[in-house]
């Protein structure tokens, strides 16, 4: 069709222009490096005008602005925290900002990751973030690392920067960043945000503790919730990300009041902050003590029993006999076999979309024994042959529910419930592509 041809031509033109723009940006970057080497001891007129509102602060001044200009910061994660933190670092005039992320921009990112736009969906996050930051401030250098941080590349990448900002959303990477920063003697500005709450601290700064001082061992995988599962309000990541930039700037300037040895908690429900004193540096910490046993990076996915990515985790708690695929469940529905489908998502998620005839019993009610076998089976309990299947959004909470319910069903001599592998996301991918995904 004529419209399809026109769209294809425009998309091709955009790809060509992006390639040309990338080449020009690289040329500009090379030219800037050449001149910046000769003027690193002073501010030019453009910089004085641009940063004047912060230069006049007694805490910054000309010498402070020069410190910012000479500084280099690596932001690990170009998502909800990394976007606001890198934005304010660029605005403040940090001379070299590195952006590390392995992912591409998705529509679900845009409510909180404000460096990305509808036009950059499908691009790598690092390229999208770099383009935005350089549009904001052409006088700084922005380097990109489109890769997943691993034990093999972490030291090589981190050693190029003065300070590291942890803007990730998974436990394994937190341990990896901590250990790498300890080995390289670099401060780590760590933030997290979930639902309507956030927290912030600085590790490995001067005599303060590192992450392992406070958390020597990782939590069980099934107890960890990321924003993909638990949700997050974009304004919360904005608050914490901006504060990460503030702490980074204070470290660069050498100012007092850095959140080392303290934890800042933000409650978005009440719009309140709490400042807690943390335990000091652990004398026998495996990473940062005087005689550390950890002298090189390890396999952090193995150590934490979870993937070192911000992508949705996939638990594996049940035996194959306790699970069925979405295709198998579709066959059960088509054959009109009598069964009960339990959806363990929260009521607000259940309202978004649900499979026909499913019963909503939230996972929290199941785990806290507020609702059990009778709530699930109802009048069907007298039928020993009724099959019970459990579904959730991605197939994690449903496994927890089955593991909790199995002994209760066994006590009553009833067949064990079975988990639907991959949850509603798998249903959309493999059975009904029109079923909403979120």
Curated annotation (Swiss-Prot):
Its main location: cytoplasm. The keyword Zinc applies. Zn(2+) binds at residues 210, 213, 285, 288. Its EC number is 2.7.7.80, 2.8.1.11. Keywords: ATP-binding, Cytoplasm, Metal-binding, Molybdenum cofactor biosynthesis, Multifunctional enzyme, Nucleotide-binding, Nucleotidyltransferase, Transferase, tRNA processing, Zinc. One of its GO terms (molecular function) is ATP binding. Disulfide bonds: none annotated. It is found in: Cytoplasm, Cytosol. The active site is at residues 227, 392. It is an enzyme of class 2 (transferase). GO terms for cellular component: cytosol. Its cofactor is Zn(2+). PANTHER family: ADENYLYLTRANSFERASE AND SULFURTRANSFERASE MOCS3 (PTHR10953:SF102), UBIQUITIN-ACTIVATING ENZYME E1 (PTHR10953). Plays a central role in 2-thiolation of mcm(5)S(2)U at tRNA wobble positions of cytosolic tRNA(Lys), tRNA(Glu) and tRNA(Gln). Also essential during biosynthesis of the molybdenum cofactor. Acts by mediating the C-terminal thiocarboxylation of sulfur carriers URM1 and MOCS2A. Its N-terminus first activates URM1 and MOCS2A as acyl-adenylates (-COAMP), then the persulfide sulfur on the catalytic cysteine is transferred to URM1 and MOCS2A to form thiocarboxylation (-COSH) of their C-terminus. NCBIfam families: PRK05690.1. This is Adenylyltransferase and sulfurtransferase MOCS3. It comes from Culex quinquefasciatus (Southern house mosquito).
């Amino acid at each position: 069709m004529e419209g399809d041809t026109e769209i294809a031509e425009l998309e091709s033109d955009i790809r060509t222009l992006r390639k040309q723009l990338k080449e020009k940006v690289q040329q500009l970057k090379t030219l800037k490096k050449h001149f910046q080497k000769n003027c690193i001891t002073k501010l030019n007129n453009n910089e004085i005008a641009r940063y004047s509102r912060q230069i006049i602060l007694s805490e910054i001044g000309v010498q402070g602005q020069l410190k910012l200009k000479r500084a280099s910061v690596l932001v690990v994660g170009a998502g909800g925290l990394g976007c606001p933190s890198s934005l304010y670092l660029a605005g403040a005039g940090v001379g070299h900002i590195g952006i590390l992320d392995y992912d591409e921009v998705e529509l679900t990112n845009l409510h909180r990751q404000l460096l990305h736009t509808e036009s950059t969906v499908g691009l790598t996050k690092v390229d999208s973030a770099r383009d935005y930051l350089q549009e904001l401030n052409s006088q700084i250098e922005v380097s990109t690392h489109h890769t997943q941080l691993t034990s093999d590349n972490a030291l090589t990448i981190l050693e190029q920067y003065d300070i590291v900002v942890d803007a990730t959303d998974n436990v394994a990477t937190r341990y990896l960043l901590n250990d790498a920063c300890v080995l390289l003697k670099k401060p780590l500005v760590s933030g997290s945000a979930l639902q309507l709450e956030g927290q912030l601290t600085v590790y490995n700064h001067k005599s303060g503790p590192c992450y392992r001082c406070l958390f020597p061992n990782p939590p069980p995988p099934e107890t960890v919730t990321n924003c993909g599962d638990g949700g997050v309000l974009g304004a919360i990541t904005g608050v914490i990300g901006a504060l990460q930039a503030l702490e980074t700037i204070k470290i660069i300037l050498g100012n007092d009041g850095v959140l080392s040895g303290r934890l800042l908690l933000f409650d978005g429900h009440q719009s309140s902050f709490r400042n807690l004193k943390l335990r000091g540096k652990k004398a026998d910490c495996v990473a940062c003590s005087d005689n550390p046993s950890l002298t090189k990076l390890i396999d952090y996915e193995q150590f934490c029993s979870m993937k070192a990515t911000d992508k949705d985790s996939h638990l594996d708690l049940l035996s194959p006999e306790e699970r069925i695929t979405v295709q198998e469940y579709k066959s059960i529905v088509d054959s009109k076999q009598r069964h009960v489908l339990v959806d363990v998502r929260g009521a607000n998620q259940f309202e978004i979309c649900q499979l026909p005839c499913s019963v909503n019993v939230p996972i929290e009610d199941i785990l806290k024994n507020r609702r059990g076998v009778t709530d699930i089976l109802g009048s069907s309990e007298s039928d020993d042959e009724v099959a019970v299947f459990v579904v959730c959004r991605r197939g994690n909470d449903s496994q927890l529910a089955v593991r909790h319910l199995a002994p209760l069903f066994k006590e009553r001599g009833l067949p064990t419930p079975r988990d639907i592998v991959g949850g509603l996301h798998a249903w959309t991918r493999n059975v009904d592509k029109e079923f909403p995904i979120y």
